[in-house]
Amino acid sequence: MSDLENFRVEVKDWLDKNCPSTMRAGAPADTPIDEVWGGRKAVYKNPDSKLWLDRMGEKGWTMPTVPKEYGGGGLNKEEVKILNEEMFAIGARAPLLSFGIWMLAPVLLEYGNEAQKREHLPKIIKGEIRWCQGYSEPGSGSDLASLATKAEDMGDHFLVNGQKVWTSYADKADWIFALVRTGPKEPKHNGISFLL
């Protein structure tokens, strides 16, 4: 058997033992369906939702390509394909969807320093912290080059002044990542920073 064939057997076995029946195709129609955004404010009507998130997060499979040192699964593309195929085969629902997974984690992996990666990636992967994005502003909408929220570097922190709007799920988020203007004298498409 090849390594990938062995991995497929391992995934099937793990899913069989760890994916609750209410998180699979064929679950009773009256099974409560929870949001899968995670975070400290999450409320789970179905305890299996939290159990499934915890198990997948512990395995690192909510972000399977992230290196294990940051809490991810450390899988390669072929292994992720197998994981997705086997989850699809049993109709397993995604244990976690979030701005942290879609938008923040890739930025941290590419541009974050080591401390930021170690602090935030494991919490994103396990669904412990929920993030929202702070991009849109009154009068600018999706024209991010025209944003006016300013951030002044105070040495050990930034002082942020401005307003963000249309921030989906801000009321349920634990943290925000935002685009802010740190170079006010630069052309409007420059001088923008990404703050946590």
Give residue spans per PLM region.
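Amphipathic, small/basic residue-rich leader segments at the start of a protein or domain
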Residues: M1-S98, A115-K126
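Short, solvent-exposed loop/turn elements at beta->coil junctions and helix N-caps
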Residues: E69, S136-S140, V165-W166
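A short, Trp-centered hydrophobic/proline-enriched beta-strand micro-motif
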Residues: G127-Y135, L179
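A short core secondary-structure module
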Residues: A148, H157, N161-L196
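Conserved protein kinase catalytic domain
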Residues: N84, A105-L108, L121, L196
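Hydrophobic, small-residue-rich alpha-helical packing segments that form membrane-like cores
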Residues: S140-D143, F158
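N-terminal glycine-rich flavin-associated loop
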Residues: L96-A115, G141
